[in-house]
Every structure is written in structure tokens, then in C-alpha cells.
Amino acid sequence: MAPKVKVTREDIVETSVGIVRMVSIESLNARAIATALNCSTQPIFSNFASMEELHLAVIERAYSIYQGYLQREVDEGIYPTYKATGMAYIRFAKEERELFKLLFMCDRSEQQDFGKWEFDDMTLDIVRDSTGLDENTMKFFHLEVWAYVHGIATMFATGFLDLDWDMVSRMLTDAYLGLRKQYGME
């Protein structure tokens, strides 16, 4: 008798991320995962208490992939650090459409922090270094930049628009310089 093939938690998460990448989060269910892994649904529910727990693991993995995009774009040194974060966000939207939608184009009205626009410390450090603005002004400056970047990224993620990277770079520079002027940072 052949030994049982052990399906690990990581196998399930990676397969689930693959399904989301190919189709969407709405297509993620135990049967689809089991079919892709060539197993029953039993290993899925042995490793995860619920599909919601698995969805959270998929979101965590998708965010890790996004963080990789950020790190690579910054490390390449093609753009100033702040601009590199915007370029990475847009590149992620273009290359990982469904993961981008999962992370950044979902209804958050039911979340506890709905309506808050707090940013992580790393982002705020980058904005501070780039602008020299005080804390509150800097946060609003970044919100304005992020809204612009998110608009471009959304057009890529939905297939509405496809621009070359030089044009995207120019657009981000123009928006950034325009906001700097608006904030009196010429």
C-alpha cells in the first residue's frame, strides 16, 4: 500500500493563492482547492478551522507577495524611495491583478477601522524623508498621493488602461511635484 501524501498548510495556502491569481477570491472554495491538490477536502479542514481562516491566510500571503514588490522596487534604486513605493503598487496591480483586487479593491465598510486612513510606520518614514512635513500635513500629503497612485493602479488591475512604465513614472513625478508646489515645498 502506498503511503499517504501529506498535504501541508503551506501547500493549501500556496494552492489557494494560485486559484485566486488565476480566477478570483470568489472562486476559492474547499472543492476547488482539493481538486487542485488532487486530494479530498479533509486536509483543508484538518489544517484550517474554517474557510474564513484560510481566506485570512491567503490575504496574509498576498500581502507578503505585495511586500516583495515594494522591496524589489526600492532595492533596484531606479526611482527615489517614495516614488518606488508608488511604482511597486502599480506594478503589483498590473502583474497580480486578482491579488491586488483582494488586498486593495474590497469592501471594507464592515471592518472596525473603516474610514480611518492610517499608514504604516515604514511608509510614514519614507514620506517624512521625502517631504520634511510635520506629522499631520505629511499624512494628508501621502493620502493625496496614494489616491492618485491607487487610481492608476485600479485602471491597470481592471484592464481599463495600460500605459508604459515611462509614462507612469512621469505621471507620478508630475503629481508629486504639483503637490509639493501646493504645499509650498518648491
Where are each of the predicted segments found?
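Secondary-structure edge/capping motif, primarily at the C-terminal ends of alpha-helices
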Residues: 70-74, 103, 107, 156-160
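Conserved alpha-helical segments that form or flank metal/cofactor-binding pockets of metalloenzymes
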Residues: 95-101
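N-terminal intrinsically disordered/low-complexity leader segments
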Residues: 1-7, 184-186
